[in-house]
């Protein structure tokens, strides 16, 4: 009897660290390519040519922006994939597919949309530096700086011969964190035009990074989640490819996809102590976003987006 009681208590302890049911589920109009939280709103990029803005506090969609159809070599009416979205001071940036496998940068302000042609069609990500400047990252690991008024590139540099994986920017828009196929993460000081730090984290390609409050987490092919916090780099061996990662706004809680079931582990970014596991049941996770320290959003290449209460 004592043995059975002990096993019951042990199982309760184990499963208490797992969350199996989300508090809320919403559905985008098309498969989700990524999500990002900006000023408390969830910006959802889809492969159906839409940017869908959801207000978590009000539990409703504020707006759905639908891009025009594009032409391909097989059809004159295809929906463009939205590659990424950013927003600053009421101005929105949308990096989208264009006609015949091109890329188009759209700037939306006061309800008006304008497009900017880009010479480099290998652009993978775009982020605001300020109201008039944008950083563009190409898959060939070149970073370009674009003046929105003139539409001209005013500066650029190449990081390495390795392909670019991902790019994020600090809250003050002063530092770019750039992840590469080589497994390294570069921290570029925009004002000083120099690398402040280079971290050699992974032995192979990096899938995803998050960068909040000076803390960085990366996930890669080598089944490692790397966390740089308080000047120290720590590594977690997950045993599976780490496709998606995320951080709370203060950087104190780190999250990463941990296995083939798309479970998401949440840990203390300094001690690496486990906080909980989210049993998402989704396909491969492509973004993990913290609404707050207590609420996390997970998405995958599907319409379903899940909200989780973690504390």
Predicted segments, located by residue:
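Hydrophobic core register within WD40 beta-propeller blades
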Residues: 35, 83-85, 125-126, 167, ...
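WD40 beta-propeller blade core
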Residues: 52, 103-106, 144, 186, ...
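Conserved strand-to-loop turn within each blade of WD40 beta-propeller repeats
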Residues: 46-47, 97-99, 137-140, 179-182, ...
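Short loop/turn segments that connect beta-strands within beta-propeller blades
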Residues: 56-59, 107-111, 147-151, 189-193, ...
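Residue-level detector of Asp-centered blade-edge/turn motifs that repeat once per structural unit
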Residues: 37-39, 87-89, 129-131, 171-172, ...
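Beta-strand-rich domains and repeat architectures in extracellular enzymes and scaffolds
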Residues: 24-49
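Hydrophobic beta-strand positions that form the internal "hydrophobic ladder"
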Residues: 42, 92-93, 134-135, 176, ...
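A short beta-strand motif characteristic of beta-propeller blades
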Residues: 21-27, 60-75, 111-117, 152-158, ...
């Amino acid at each position: 009897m004592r043995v059975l009681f002990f096993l019951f208590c042990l199982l309760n302890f184990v499963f208490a660290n797992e969350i199996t049911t989300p508090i809320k589920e919403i559905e985008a109009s098309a498969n989700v390519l990524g999500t990002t939280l900006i000023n408390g709103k969830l910006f959802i990029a889809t492969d159906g040519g839409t940017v869908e803005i959801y207000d978590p506090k009000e539990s409703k969609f504020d707006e759905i922006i639908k891009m025009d159809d594009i032409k391909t070599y097989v059809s004159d009416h295809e929906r463009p994939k939205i590659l990424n979205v950013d927003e600053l001071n009421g101005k929105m940036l949308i990096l989208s597919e264009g006609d015949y496998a091109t890329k188009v940068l759209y700037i939306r302000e006061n309800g008006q949309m304008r497009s900017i042609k880009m010479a480099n069609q290998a652009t993978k990500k775009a982020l605001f530096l300020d109201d008039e400047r944008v950083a563009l990252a190409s898959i060939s690991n070149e970073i370009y700086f674009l003046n929105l008024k003139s539409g001209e590139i005013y500066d650029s540099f190449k990081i390495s011969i390795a392909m670019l994986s991902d790019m994020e920017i600090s809250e003050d828009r002063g530092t770019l964190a750039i992840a590469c196929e080589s497994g390294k993460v570069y921290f570029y000081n925009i004002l000083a035009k120099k690398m402040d730090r280079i971290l050699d984290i992974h032995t192979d390609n990096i899938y995803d990074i998050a960068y909040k409050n000076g803390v960085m987490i990366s996930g890669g092919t080598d089944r490692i989640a790397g966390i740089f916090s308080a000047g120290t780099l720590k590594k977690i061996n997950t045993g599976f490819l780490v496709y998606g990662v995320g951080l709370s706004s203060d950087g104190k809680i780190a999250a990463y996809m941990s296995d083939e079931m798309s479970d998401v582990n949440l840990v203390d970014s300094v001690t690496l102590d486990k906080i909980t596991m989210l049993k998402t049941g989704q396909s491969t996770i492509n973004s993990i976003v913290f609404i707050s320290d207590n609420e996390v959003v997970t998405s995958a290449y599907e319409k379903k987006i899940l909200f989780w209460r973690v504390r």
